[in-house]
Amino acid sequence: AVAERPILIHSHNDYCRRAPFWQAYAQQVYSIEADVFLHGGKLLVGHEVEDLSPGMTFEALYVEPLVTLFGRNGGRAWKDSGEHLQLMVELKSATEPTLQAVAALLGRYPEVFDPAVNPEAVRIVVTGRVPAPADFGKYPSYIRFDGVWDADYTPAQLERIALISADFSDYSQWNGKGSIDIDHLNALGLS
């Protein structure tokens, strides 16, 4: 018998959805992404500075719902599931102050965001304006980072890498429309 594996779905630019966070959460996606700016002392969510709205805070759209759900679900993302949730935080403004503000906010809820406190905690992955690998240690250990394909990480730095990103166009010219043809599947090693 073959064990059933969950399909890992990522909600890219989740804040653009009709119901940010909730729409993806209801589908039990594996990963939700929010683009975050530190703007006027607040962590705001949006794709560009001109898109920012004072009511679209990272705390209100993502952190508070997660804190509520973890309280309701016995310390896990979904009450009847052992699956973990990943929250990708794409830093869109200056790395250090933005990440410090994110860490300060998440640090108020270790039972939700720190796997050392709760093994079922949300996995936090920082992408976008990722700090230099030498600076990873400045941030709490529960914050992990999106790595780059050609970086030369030390073993300690590699421990902080959650995933490695690469430009898809380096491997295939498929534009995502229609079915992928056999040549592109072969190029990706998926046939």
What are these regions (language model features)?
Residues 2-15, 20-33, 37-191:
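Catalytic cores of phosphodiester-bond hydrolases, prominently lipid phosphodiesterases
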